């Protein structure tokens, strides 16, 4: 039990939590501003509400699936966690979404929004970002 607690603390300690403007710059540099018509502010809002910009965020859902990483990408549809029956549409292991190298997560998020639901696939975006004034998400970032 003590070993498990230590391992969990190490995993949390190694999490990368981005500062809002730093994250916005990274997203812009990865071509997310305007990708599929989605503004940078929408991406920043989405990830604020999904993970608070935390690369190691996970959330277990009532259907047995898990959401992974800074975008909270779901194991039922987008990645393989070897526990959930999956479509694995991003063709990745879910653990790849929990690393500090967010390029895989960004590529998968781009794949998600190519589906008919677009950015609406994320409940947090629908509840907190859709139709809102999102200017505060880029305020002070110089973007």
Swiss-Prot record:
Location of the protein in the cell: Secreted
- According to the record, glycans are attached at 80
Which ranges does the record mark as transmembrane?
none
Q: Signal peptide: which range, if any?
A: 1-15
Show the disulfide pairing: 21-141, 45-129, 79-94, 90-108
EC number(s) reported in the record: 3.2.1.17
Coarse class of the protein's main subcellular location: secreted
Q: What class of enzyme is it?
A: hydrolase
Q: Name one Pfam family in it.
A: Lys
Which keywords belong to this entry?
Antimicrobial, Bacteriolytic enzyme, Disulfide bond, Glycoprotein, Glycosidase, Hydrolase, Secreted, Signal
Cellular component, GO, one term? extracellular region
Q: How does it assemble?
A: Monomer.
Q: What else is known?
A: Lysozyme C is capable of both hydrolysis and transglycosylation; it also shows a slight esterase activity. It acts rapidly on both peptide-substituted and unsubstituted peptidoglycan, and slowly on chitin oligosaccharides.
Name it.
Answer: Lysozyme C
Lineage runs: Eukaryota, Metazoa, Chordata, Craniata, Vertebrata
């Amino acid at each position: 039990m003590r070993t498990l607690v230590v391992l969990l603390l190490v995993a949390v300690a190694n999490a990368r939590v981005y500062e809002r403007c730093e994250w916005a710059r990274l997203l812009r540099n990865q071509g997310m501003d305007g990708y599929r018509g989605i503004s940078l502010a929408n991406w920043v809002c989405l990830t604020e509400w999904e993970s608070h910009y935390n690369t190691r965020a996970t959330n277990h859902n009532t259907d047995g699936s898990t959401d992974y990483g800074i975008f909270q990408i779901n194991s039922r549809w987008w990645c393989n966690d070897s526990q959930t029956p999956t479509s694995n549409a991003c063709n990745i292991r879910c653990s790849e979404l929990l690393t500090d190298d967010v390029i895989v997560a960004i590529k998968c998020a781009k794949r998600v929004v190519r589906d008919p639901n677009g950015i609406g696939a994320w409940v947090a975006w629908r509840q907190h970002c859709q139709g809102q004034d999102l200017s505060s998400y880029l305020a002070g970032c110089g973007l």
